[in-house]
Amino acid sequence: MRTIAAVAAVLLLAGCKASAPAETTQQLMKNKVDPASKVYFDAVQYISDETGEHDIKPQTDADWEKVRKAAADLQEYGKQLQGDDYAKGRNPDWVKFSQAMVDVSKEAEQAAKGKNVDKVFEVSGTIYSVCSACHMAYPLPVPPAASGTPAPSPSA
């Protein structure tokens, strides 16, 4: 009986061990957020070039489903970013930015569900604004130049 209790205790404690996030913030952005946002941003476009005017929009139910799923995925990533794995040690505005991503992504999903081309286009701009505001507050680290000397700061 003691052996069973000891094994159970070890297993229970092993389950309590803190684990690192599966991805860093930069990896989550690069591997998940960026691709999902690209699907949404690219769904509706109005292009005017030397070949004429081009209205890009989802054509099939499957196209619309991809756009809807991208918005739903962005909601989930926003929720992930609010968790301790990503928010711990950051200013409280990190959670506010992440929640703004969730909120606008809900609106984006509804626009896609409704197959509302104009609303998808409009919400794309709002998503971009939310992301840009966060990136202004939390800029990506500037990698060192190839020569080994630090690269100039973005404000220089």
Q: What residues fall within each predicted segment?
A:
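Bacterial N-terminal signal peptides that target proteins for export
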Residues: 1-6
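C-terminal motif of bacterial Sec signal peptides marking the signal peptidase cleavage site
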Residues: 12-15
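Sequence context surrounding c-type heme c attachment/ligation sites in exported
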Residues: 17-156
